[in-house]
């Protein structure tokens, strides 16, 4: 796939990189702005992050931005952080929560009806550029291995051999009146596994996967399975009764018994998990739950800096030159060819209104993300 170096290019005006494309959101379905297959772009972006290649990461993220594929972009960001960074620098979870809130603020200041126009917003470009730089620089850990559930594991007669909890009190802390009673023994085991007493990371992951498999079997039999509504889940109300929130209820309640920073980390992970949540997306985001378990079960050193101090200057330099990426992408736009007639003209009334509404100032020249 095509990629080149951008940050040696000097860009003087935002107009040089302003995207004026005739295509609507529907025309980008399955493709990036430059007509690469979206699946391939996501793969290239993830590989760029894995191999710490900042410039390609900025390019491929911009391809998704210019096509309005923000959900896909955030999914790649969450996947990379939760699977490849996790305890290497878990503080990045708090940082990402901050940036998601910044992203929502920008959208709510005039872009709710047309997310494609976000591609020309300078703060959006710098926001994702900064995220790419920080993820590329992040300290890594070995990726989590998926825990497999065997068919025999669903046998209710033999599964009891895996039970370790000494009492039923662990599950009683989280189970509510309308929660499915048949799940209680397994919820109790999961809750015990993440306590300081039980402290069994492998079994905690096992019980999560067991609950997932049980839910899948119920759906296959067309049996509805829901829990009592958990209002702490900031998702669509129809999704607040998904079984997954029992698991997060366990994590949140256990974190309340730990230090303030662990509580803050857990709340941040919960917030990341809820981003554009739909029933079934927990499979894509289960590494966030694996990370939550690791935080509760492992001794780890919490990094206070989101990025190495020596790299902070480089990040700011790249942010200031990010428009050079969009200059390259602009070459692939589909337009009338008459944009030169409007070069230098003032923005539309809507754009001017957005600028007045936009009071956020999170991207200073010398900004260094730090807890």
What would you call each of these model-derived segments?
Residues 36-40:
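Generic helix N-cap/helix-start motif at coil->alpha-helix transitions
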Residues 25-26, 56-59, 66-371:
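C-terminal alpha-helical interaction modules of replication/initiation AAA+ assemblies
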Residues 3-4, 8:
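Cysteine-centered motifs
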Residues 44-47, 53, 61-63:
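Conserved helicase/translocase motor-coupling segment
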Residues 13-27:
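Short, charge-rich, low-complexity alpha-helical interaction segments
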Residues 28, 42:
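Active-site-adjacent structural elements in folded domains
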């Amino acid at each position: 796939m095509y990629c080149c170096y951008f940050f040696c290019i000097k860009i003087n005006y935002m107009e040089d990189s302003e995207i004026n494309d005739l295509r609507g959101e529907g025309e980008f379905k399955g493709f990036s702005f430059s007509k690469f297959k979206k699946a391939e772009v996501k793969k290239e972006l993830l590989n760029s992050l894995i191999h710490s290649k900042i410039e390609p990461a900025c390019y491929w993220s911009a391809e998704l931005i210019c096509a309005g594929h923000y959900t896909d972009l955030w999914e790649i960001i969450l996947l990379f952080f939760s699977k490849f960074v996790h305890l290497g620098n878990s503080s990045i979870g708090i940082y990402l929560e901050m940036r998601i809130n910044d992203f929502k603020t920008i959208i709510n200041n005039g872009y709710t009806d047309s997310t494609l126009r976000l591609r020309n917003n300078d703060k959006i470009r710098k926001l994702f550029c900064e995220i790419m730089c920080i993820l590329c620089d992040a300290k890594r850990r070995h990726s989590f291995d998926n825990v497999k559930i065997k068919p025999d594991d669903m046998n209710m007669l033999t599964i009891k051999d895996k039970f370790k909890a000494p009492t039923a009190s662990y599950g009683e802390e989280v189970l509510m009146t309308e929660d499915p009673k048949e799940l209680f023994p397994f919820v109790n085991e999961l809750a015990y596994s993440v306590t300081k007493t039980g402290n069994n990371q492998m079994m905690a992951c096992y019980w999560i996967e067991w609950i997932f498999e049980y839910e899948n079997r119920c759906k296959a039999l067309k049996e509805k399975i829901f829990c009592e509504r958990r209002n702490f889940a900031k998702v669509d109300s129809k999704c607040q009764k998904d079984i997954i929130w029992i698991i997060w209820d366990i994590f949140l309640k256990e974190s309340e018994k730990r230090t303030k920073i662990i509580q803050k980390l857990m709340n941040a992970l919960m917030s990341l998990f809820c981003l554009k949540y739909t029933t079934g997306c927990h499979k894509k985001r289960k590494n966030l739950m694996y990370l939550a378990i690791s935080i509760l079960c492992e001794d780890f050193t919490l990094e206070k800096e989101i990025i190495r101090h020596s790299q902070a200057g480089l990040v700011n330099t790249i942010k200031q030159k990010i428009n050079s990426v969009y200059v390259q992408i602009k070459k692939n736009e589909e337009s009338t060819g008459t944009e030169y007639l409007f070069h230098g003209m003032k923005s539309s009334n809507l754009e001017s209104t957005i600028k007045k509404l936009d009071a956020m100032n999170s991207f200073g020249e010398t900004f260094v993300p730090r807890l």
